[in-house]
Amino acid sequence: MAALGSPLRTWRGLLRELRYLNAATGRPYRDTAAYRYLVKAFRAHRVTSEKLCRAQHELHFQAATYLCLLRSIREHVALHQEFHGKGERSVEESAGLVGLKLPQQPGGKGWEP
């Protein structure tokens, strides 16, 4: 994992992923146990002065790791839905998956298939 960034950015990313998870259920993300736990943990490890706090850095690292997990799961599900085998595909669909287009069949007067 690269540099952690700011705790606020990690916090916002976690909230965004919670919103994505709860969009399917229709429930507000603030009603979940995960949200309440994150709020409680971030408030408990908030530092008001510039002292070095190991617990805050550990919390930030764990939160960033959890954010990476949630984001990876969401992207995996999206890729799985897009590319999962749905039986036999047509030639046009297979070409479209890799970004190609089939040439158009010539038509008009005198053309016989």
Swiss-Prot record:
User: Which of UniProt's keywords are assigned here?
Assistant: Mitochondrion
| One BP term from GO | mitochondrial proton-transporting ATP synthase complex assembly
Protein localization: Mitochondrion
Q: What is the lineage of its organism?
A: Eukaryota, Metazoa, Chordata, Craniata, Vertebrata
GO CC field: mitochondrion
Q: Does the keyword Mitochondrion apply?
A: yes
- What does the similarity note say? Belongs to the FMC1 family.
Pfam families found in the cross-reference section: Complex1_LYR_2 (PF13233)
Query: What name does this protein carry?
Result: Protein FMC1 homolog
Q: Which organism is it from?
A: Bos taurus (Bovine)
Q: Which gene encodes it?
A: FMC1
Q: What is its main location?
A: mitochondrion
Q: Where is this region: Disordered?
A: 93-113
Q: List the disulfide bonds.
A: none
Summarizing the function annotation, the protein's role is: Plays a role in the assembly/stability of the mitochondrial membrane ATP synthase (F(1)F(0) ATP synthase or Complex V).
